[in-house]
Amino acid sequence: MKILTGSRGDEVHEHLYENGQRRVGHRILKKNTVTNNGEFHPVPGNIVLIPLKGTVKLTTPDQECTIKNGQLAILGSTDSFYLTAIDDVEFVGVVDIK
């Protein structure tokens, strides 16, 4: 068993765990932050995004969705995306790297 604890701060982008093709990332974004300057970023593999706090808008070339604590989003390895923090937001991403 591993217990993982992420960093604290206004802007955090870190990998909490990486083993083979599995990566667990942790992000904290301030309200109104848009990742990658609103440009689509290729997905490194299948991703499950799990908000811990706040609301985040996930934008792909084909759709937009807003997710919050208690929900999750699944992106396929062929997707590209960027995120917009609707509130101050904290989330975890679990990636199966291609």
Locations of regions flagged by a protein language model:
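Short strand-coil-strand connectors
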Residues: 20, 59-63, 86
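Short acidic-glycine-tyrosine-enriched beta hairpin
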Residues: 61-78
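Short, conserved beta-strand element in jelly-roll/cupin
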Residues: 41-57
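Ligand-binding loop in jelly-roll beta-barrel domains
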Residues: 77-98
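A short, N-terminal "cap"/entry segment at the start of jelly-roll beta-barrel domains
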Residues: 1-28, 36-39
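Short, charged/polar surface micro-motifs in flexible loops or helix N-caps
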Residues: 21-22, 30-35, 53-55, 97-98
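Short hydrophobic beta-strand segments that form the core of ligand-binding sensory/regulatory domains
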Residues: 27, 47, 92-94
